[in-house]
Amino acid sequence: MSYFGTDGIRGKFGELPITPDFILKLGYVTGLVLIENNQNSPRKPSVVIGKDTRLSGYVIEGALQAGFNAAGVDVYMLGPLPTPAIAHLTRSFNADAGVVISASHNPYYDNGIKFFSADGKKLTDAMQNAINDKLDAIMAVDGNNDAVMPILDPAQLGKNNRIDDAKGRYIEFCKGSFPYQYDLDHLTVVVDCANGAGYSVAPRVMRELGANVIAINNKPDGININADCGSTHPEGLQEAVLKYEADVGIALDGDGDRIVMVDEAGNLVDGDGILYVLATQGQTKVAGVVGTLMSNMGLELALKAADIEFTRAKVGDRYVMQELEANGWILGGEPSGHILCLDKSRTGDAIIASLQILAVMQARGKALSDLTEGFEVLPQKLVNVRLSQMQDPFEHEELVVAFDKARATLEGRGRLLIRQSGTEPMIRVMVESDDEIECDVMANDLADKIKAILG
């Protein structure tokens, strides 16, 4: 079976695959794959491990570390840091892989594992498949770990190292992405840290560049990550920007790879708006932009008017990355806030993306609301339909007929997208139309029909 979804391995803690026993085996077989891929190297393979602020992260961290060490792989423990920090530090430490313990924007009771290759990018399909195959083999042997996890001579075991300066290294990396000729003096910035991995580093980066920072949701307790805060719940940020009369608001998600922003008037600027500003007014001229199937048609039209090419990838930042590399472009992302600026970082990074927007504001002397003029969002309605178990809606004829009828209604003036989540039992229904009422009615009607049939 395939243990990997669109963004690593994810689930509810305590249920397969997110159990200590499974995670131990995952660390072990991943270690074996790294050893096989580095047979000609004179040194042991090494990995860096970071996490977000979930309580379950401590248990998973220990199990992963033990699995890697048992396979003969050295481990560098970085503690709570954003996902993009782990991608950067994987390269900085010359490690063979990076591992992030996080379920991103999900609630605290979920957790997951994401991997980076030695170059700080998402794992190749080939390496992911190799890990998956070894997991299949080890899970097939019931109740006898010694049969599938041979004990090494103690001299061959991996070592465990805790790194104290990882946070400082990442902060300097982020600051280095901001143009040296500008600073953030005289800017008041509200930062919603989602009680997640960026709770410490995000406000500090902004302060060290000169901003007056008001940090909210920056006191994680292990269970309040993403709880009515962060990029998936920006209402509190919008209120805070207005309350403190701030110049801009920035909201991260739980693992710090997604960002949405709020302008000085309290208006939300999602990933599409961020891409529009960076593509049309950013410091680096771009030939084209990669969005996804979820990107608003308004972004496509606005970029076309600016003579900038636009193409859509499948949903997921790994697919955006693949499309960017195929086209030789540097800018892409998703409405949810995964923003890839490949001239600055090799993965989606909320802090670095926000700094590029702040740089445009400072360079042009304009407010964020002024920078987003010219980008008109087409009415869009997104409804998430949670199911009791993962099911394919396209296997039910009644649903297929309903989808076809809706697409015919929208032809030439809107879009319908039906998509299964890659990480949880959920169907996403997205409707775009030049008629806002039609959007709401059609999306809700289709969602109700999916729920009634699939349960």
UniProtKB/Swiss-Prot annotation:
What reaction is this protein's catalytic activity?
alpha-D-glucosamine 1-phosphate = D-glucosamine 6-phosphate
PTMs per UniProt: Activated by phosphorylation.
Q: Which GO terms describe its cellular component?
A: cytosol
What GO biological process terms does the UniProt entry carry, in alphabetical order? carbohydrate metabolic process; peptidoglycan biosynthetic process; UDP-N-acetylglucosamine biosynthetic process
UniProt KW Cell membrane keyword: no
Task: State the Pfam families in the record.
Answer: PGM_PMM_I (PF02878), PGM_PMM_II (PF02879), PGM_PMM_III (PF02880), PGM_PMM_IV (PF00408)
The coenzyme or cofactor needed here is: Mg(2+)
Gene3D superfamilies named among the record's database cross-references: Alpha-D-Glucose-1,6-Bisphosphate, subunit A, domain 3, Alpha-D-phosphohexomutase, C-terminal domain
Homology family:
Belongs to the phosphohexose mutase family.
Q: What is this protein called?
A: Phosphoglucosamine mutase
